[in-house]
Amino acid sequence: MLQPPQRQTLAEWFETPKGAYVLEWERAQFDSAVEDVFGFKSVQVGLPSIDCLRANRMPFRFTLGAEPGCTIAADPRHWPLASHSVDLVVLPHLLEFNQDPHQILREAERVLMPEGQIVIAGFNPLSLWGLKRRLGLRRAAHPWCGEFIGLLRLRDWLKLLGFELNGGRLGRYAPPFSQAKWLQRFAFMEQAGDRWWPICGGVYVVRAVKRVRGMRLVAPQWKNGRATARALAPVARRDPAVAQAGAGHGRRASVRLRLIVGGAGRGGRARG
Protein backbone atom coordinates (compact mmCIF):
# COMPACT_ATOMS: atom_id res chain seq x y z
CA MET A 1 0.00 0.00 0.00
CA LEU A 2 1.36 3.35 -1.00
CA GLN A 3 1.95 5.81 1.82
CA PRO A 4 0.87 9.44 1.33
CA PRO A 5 3.85 11.75 0.83
CA GLN A 6 4.96 13.46 4.02
CA ARG A 7 4.84 17.22 4.17
CA GLN A 8 8.18 18.93 3.81
CA THR A 9 9.60 20.07 7.15
CA LEU A 10 10.80 23.60 7.76
CA ALA A 11 14.39 22.36 8.00
CA GLU A 12 14.00 20.73 4.57
CA TRP A 13 12.47 23.92 3.19
CA PHE A 14 15.60 25.82 4.19
CA GLU A 15 17.52 23.55 1.81
CA THR A 16 15.50 24.77 -1.20
CA PRO A 17 16.61 27.84 -3.22
CA LYS A 18 13.93 29.94 -1.53
CA GLY A 19 14.89 28.72 1.93
CA ALA A 20 18.61 29.15 1.29
CA TYR A 21 17.93 32.73 0.21
CA VAL A 22 16.31 33.42 3.59
CA LEU A 23 18.79 31.41 5.63
CA GLU A 24 21.84 33.20 4.25
CA TRP A 25 20.53 36.51 5.55
CA GLU A 26 19.28 35.09 8.85
CA ARG A 27 22.61 33.44 9.67
CA ALA A 28 24.32 36.82 9.49
CA GLN A 29 21.65 38.36 11.72
CA PHE A 30 21.88 35.57 14.29
CA ASP A 31 25.66 35.89 14.39
CA SER A 32 25.40 39.63 14.98
CA ALA A 33 22.68 39.26 17.63
CA VAL A 34 24.35 36.60 19.79
CA GLU A 35 28.07 37.33 19.50
CA ASP A 36 28.04 40.06 22.17
CA VAL A 37 25.72 38.29 24.64
CA PHE A 38 27.74 36.98 27.57
CA GLY A 39 26.98 34.50 30.31
CA PHE A 40 27.25 30.75 30.88
CA LYS A 41 24.27 29.02 29.26
CA SER A 42 22.47 29.60 25.96
CA VAL A 43 19.71 27.51 24.41
CA GLN A 44 18.26 27.31 20.91
CA VAL A 45 14.73 25.92 20.75
CA GLY A 46 13.94 24.14 17.49
CA LEU A 47 15.70 23.72 14.13
CA PRO A 48 18.81 21.92 15.44
CA SER A 49 20.12 21.57 11.87
CA ILE A 50 20.73 25.34 11.83
CA ASP A 51 23.29 26.44 14.41
CA CYS A 52 22.04 29.86 15.46
CA LEU A 53 24.49 29.97 18.39
CA ARG A 54 27.68 29.40 16.39
CA ALA A 55 28.92 32.97 17.00
CA ASN A 56 28.13 32.93 20.72
CA ARG A 57 31.00 32.37 23.16
CA MET A 58 29.19 30.96 26.18
CA PRO A 59 30.70 27.72 27.53
CA PHE A 60 27.38 25.85 27.55
CA ARG A 61 25.32 25.95 24.34
CA PHE A 62 22.61 23.43 23.57
CA THR A 63 19.45 22.85 21.52
CA LEU A 64 16.03 21.86 22.82
CA GLY A 65 13.04 20.48 20.96
CA ALA A 66 11.18 17.48 19.62
CA GLU A 67 13.19 17.18 16.39
CA PRO A 68 15.95 14.59 16.00
CA GLY A 69 19.36 16.07 16.70
CA CYS A 70 18.37 18.25 19.66
CA THR A 71 20.63 18.08 22.70
CA ILE A 72 17.58 17.99 24.97
CA ALA A 73 14.48 16.16 23.70
CA ALA A 74 11.45 18.01 25.03
CA ASP A 75 8.14 19.58 24.12
CA PRO A 76 8.93 23.17 23.04
CA ARG A 77 6.00 24.31 25.20
CA HIS A 78 7.46 22.79 28.37
CA TRP A 79 11.19 23.12 28.90
CA PRO A 80 12.92 20.85 31.46
CA LEU A 81 15.11 23.73 32.61
CA ALA A 82 15.32 25.43 35.98
CA SER A 83 13.90 28.91 36.36
CA HIS A 84 16.40 31.75 35.99
CA SER A 85 19.11 29.40 34.71
CA VAL A 86 19.79 30.58 31.13
CA ASP A 87 21.41 33.76 29.82
CA LEU A 88 20.31 33.57 26.17
CA VAL A 89 17.34 31.99 24.36
CA VAL A 90 17.08 31.79 20.56
CA LEU A 91 13.76 30.98 18.84
CA PRO A 92 14.30 30.45 15.09
CA HIS A 93 10.83 30.46 13.48
CA LEU A 94 9.34 28.58 16.42
CA LEU A 95 6.42 30.83 17.31
CA GLU A 96 4.63 30.90 13.94
CA PHE A 97 4.66 27.10 13.60
CA ASN A 98 3.37 26.28 17.09
CA GLN A 99 -0.21 26.26 18.30
CA ASP A 100 0.67 27.99 21.58
CA PRO A 101 3.31 30.68 20.97
CA HIS A 102 2.33 32.46 24.19
CA GLN A 103 3.32 29.42 26.26
CA ILE A 104 6.69 29.27 24.52
CA LEU A 105 7.37 32.90 25.40
CA ARG A 106 6.28 32.26 28.98
CA GLU A 107 8.78 29.42 29.20
CA ALA A 108 11.49 31.68 27.79
CA GLU A 109 10.71 34.32 30.41
CA ARG A 110 10.76 31.71 33.16
CA VAL A 111 14.16 30.21 32.38
CA LEU A 112 15.95 33.46 31.55
CA MET A 113 18.09 35.18 34.14
CA PRO A 114 17.33 38.83 34.92
CA GLU A 115 18.81 40.89 32.07
CA GLY A 116 18.94 37.72 29.97
CA GLN A 117 18.24 38.07 26.27
CA ILE A 118 15.98 36.44 23.71
CA VAL A 119 16.46 36.41 19.93
CA ILE A 120 13.46 35.65 17.70
CA ALA A 121 13.23 35.06 13.95
CA GLY A 122 9.94 35.16 12.08
CA PHE A 123 8.22 35.77 8.76
CA ASN A 124 6.79 39.24 8.29
CA PRO A 125 3.08 39.33 7.29
CA LEU A 126 3.54 42.88 5.92
CA SER A 127 5.66 41.74 2.99
CA LEU A 128 5.47 40.03 -0.38
CA TRP A 129 5.94 36.78 1.50
CA GLY A 130 3.00 37.59 3.74
CA LEU A 131 0.94 38.55 0.70
CA LYS A 132 1.53 35.15 -0.90
CA ARG A 133 0.38 33.46 2.29
CA ARG A 134 -2.81 35.54 2.41
CA LEU A 135 -3.56 34.60 -1.19
CA GLY A 136 -3.66 30.99 -0.04
CA LEU A 137 -1.11 29.69 -2.55
CA ARG A 138 0.19 26.30 -1.39
CA ARG A 139 -1.13 27.00 2.10
CA ALA A 140 -0.35 23.47 3.30
CA ALA A 141 3.40 23.75 2.60
CA HIS A 142 6.16 25.46 4.57
CA PRO A 143 6.45 28.28 5.31
CA TRP A 144 2.93 29.24 4.24
CA CYS A 145 1.30 26.86 6.72
CA GLY A 146 2.56 28.97 9.61
CA GLU A 147 0.82 31.83 11.38
CA PHE A 148 2.99 34.83 10.49
CA ILE A 149 3.35 37.18 13.47
CA GLY A 150 3.74 40.91 12.88
CA LEU A 151 6.39 42.90 14.72
CA LEU A 152 3.87 45.10 16.55
CA ARG A 153 2.00 42.03 17.72
CA LEU A 154 5.21 40.35 18.85
CA ARG A 155 6.30 43.51 20.64
CA ASP A 156 3.04 43.56 22.61
CA TRP A 157 3.43 39.93 23.61
CA LEU A 158 6.96 40.55 24.80
CA LYS A 159 5.97 43.69 26.67
CA LEU A 160 3.28 41.82 28.61
CA LEU A 161 5.97 39.44 29.84
CA GLY A 162 8.28 42.29 30.78
CA PHE A 163 10.62 42.07 27.78
CA GLU A 164 12.08 45.15 26.17
CA LEU A 165 13.13 45.17 22.51
CA ASN A 166 16.68 46.40 22.07
CA GLY A 167 17.55 45.52 18.50
CA GLY A 168 16.42 43.92 15.29
CA ARG A 169 16.28 44.09 11.53
CA LEU A 170 14.10 43.10 8.58
CA GLY A 171 15.40 41.73 5.29
CA ARG A 172 14.80 39.71 2.12
CA TYR A 173 12.58 41.99 0.05
CA ALA A 174 12.52 40.00 -3.20
CA PRO A 175 9.34 38.10 -4.12
CA PRO A 176 9.32 34.48 -2.91
CA PHE A 177 10.41 32.91 -6.19
CA SER A 178 11.09 29.18 -6.21
CA GLN A 179 14.02 29.37 -8.62
CA ALA A 180 17.41 30.77 -7.63
CA LYS A 181 17.89 32.61 -10.94
CA TRP A 182 14.84 34.79 -10.31
CA LEU A 183 15.89 35.52 -6.75
CA GLN A 184 19.27 36.65 -8.10
CA ARG A 185 17.65 38.89 -10.70
CA PHE A 186 15.73 40.67 -7.97
CA ALA A 187 18.75 41.05 -5.69
CA PHE A 188 18.66 44.80 -6.30
CA MET A 189 15.59 44.93 -4.05
CA GLU A 190 17.73 44.23 -0.98
CA GLN A 191 19.48 47.60 -0.89
CA ALA A 192 16.40 49.40 -2.17
CA GLY A 193 14.25 47.76 0.48
CA ASP A 194 16.60 48.67 3.32
CA ARG A 195 16.40 52.28 2.20
CA TRP A 196 12.86 52.82 0.94
CA TRP A 197 10.57 50.21 2.50
CA PRO A 198 12.40 48.62 5.45
CA ILE A 199 9.20 47.45 7.16
CA CYS A 200 8.37 45.21 4.19
CA GLY A 201 11.18 42.68 4.56
CA GLY A 202 10.09 39.07 4.21
CA VAL A 203 11.69 38.00 7.50
CA TYR A 204 12.89 39.64 10.71
CA VAL A 205 15.29 38.87 13.54
CA VAL A 206 14.75 40.81 16.78
CA ARG A 207 16.41 40.80 20.18
CA ALA A 208 14.88 41.65 23.55
CA VAL A 209 16.10 41.82 27.14
CA LYS A 210 14.37 40.59 30.27
CA ARG A 211 13.96 43.36 32.80
CA VAL A 212 13.07 42.74 36.43
CA ARG A 213 11.07 45.21 38.47
CA GLY A 214 12.83 46.48 41.54
CA MET A 215 16.28 45.92 40.05
CA ARG A 216 18.42 48.86 39.01
CA LEU A 217 22.07 49.73 38.62
CA VAL A 218 23.22 52.59 40.83
CA ALA A 219 26.52 54.40 40.38
CA PRO A 220 27.89 56.99 42.82
CA GLN A 221 27.84 60.58 41.58
CA TRP A 222 31.50 61.58 41.65
CA LYS A 223 31.95 65.35 41.52
CA ASN A 224 35.71 65.43 41.68
CA GLY A 225 38.72 63.23 42.12
CA ARG A 226 38.50 63.37 45.91
CA ALA A 227 34.96 61.97 45.97
CA THR A 228 36.28 58.44 45.72
CA ALA A 229 38.35 58.83 48.86
CA ARG A 230 35.41 60.39 50.75
CA ALA A 231 33.16 57.50 49.73
CA LEU A 232 35.47 54.95 51.32
CA ALA A 233 34.81 54.10 54.94
CA PRO A 234 37.47 55.70 57.18
CA VAL A 235 39.84 53.29 58.88
CA ALA A 236 41.92 54.31 61.90
CA ARG A 237 45.64 54.05 61.24
CA ARG A 238 48.44 54.80 63.65
CA ASP A 239 50.97 55.50 60.91
CA PRO A 240 50.17 58.80 59.10
CA ALA A 241 52.29 57.73 56.14
CA VAL A 242 50.20 54.62 55.69
CA ALA A 243 46.99 56.65 55.95
CA GLN A 244 48.22 59.11 53.30
CA ALA A 245 49.15 56.27 50.96
CA GLY A 246 45.74 54.68 51.48
CA ALA A 247 43.95 57.93 50.62
CA GLY A 248 45.98 58.26 47.45
CA HIS A 249 45.06 54.75 46.43
CA GLY A 250 41.39 55.53 47.09
CA ARG A 251 41.49 58.52 44.74
CA ARG A 252 42.68 56.23 41.98
CA ALA A 253 40.03 53.57 42.59
CA SER A 254 37.60 52.89 39.73
CA VAL A 255 33.87 53.45 40.07
CA ARG A 256 31.99 50.28 40.90
CA LEU A 257 28.39 49.63 40.02
CA ARG A 258 26.20 48.20 42.75
CA LEU A 259 23.23 46.00 41.96
CA ILE A 260 20.32 46.79 44.24
CA VAL A 261 17.44 44.32 44.21
CA GLY A 262 14.24 45.51 45.82
CA GLY A 263 10.99 43.70 46.45
CA ALA A 264 10.20 40.02 46.60
CA GLY A 265 7.95 39.89 43.54
CA ARG A 266 8.96 38.11 40.36
CA GLY A 267 8.89 40.04 37.11
CA GLY A 268 10.66 40.23 33.79
CA ARG A 269 11.48 42.29 30.83
CA ALA A 270 13.51 40.95 27.90
CA ARG A 271 15.75 42.71 25.41
CA GLY A 272 15.81 41.96 21.88
Task: Locate each region found by the language model.
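A short glycine-rich, Lys/Arg-flanked "PGG" loop and its adjoining helix->strand segment in the class I
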Residues: 102-117
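A short SAM/SAH-binding and catalytic strip from SAM-dependent methyltransferases
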Residues: 87-102
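C-terminal lobe and adjacent flexible extensions of AdoMet/dcAdoMet transferase-like proteins
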Residues: 188-272
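Short alpha-helix
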Residues: 135, 145-168
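Conserved catalytic loop of SAM-dependent methyltransferase domains
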Residues: 165-190, 199-200
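A short acidic, Gly/Pro-enriched loop at the edge of an enzyme's catalytic core
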Residues: 77-89
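Conserved class I S-adenosyl-L-methionine
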Residues: 117-145
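Class I SAM-dependent methyltransferase SAM/SAH-binding core
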Residues: 28, 32-79
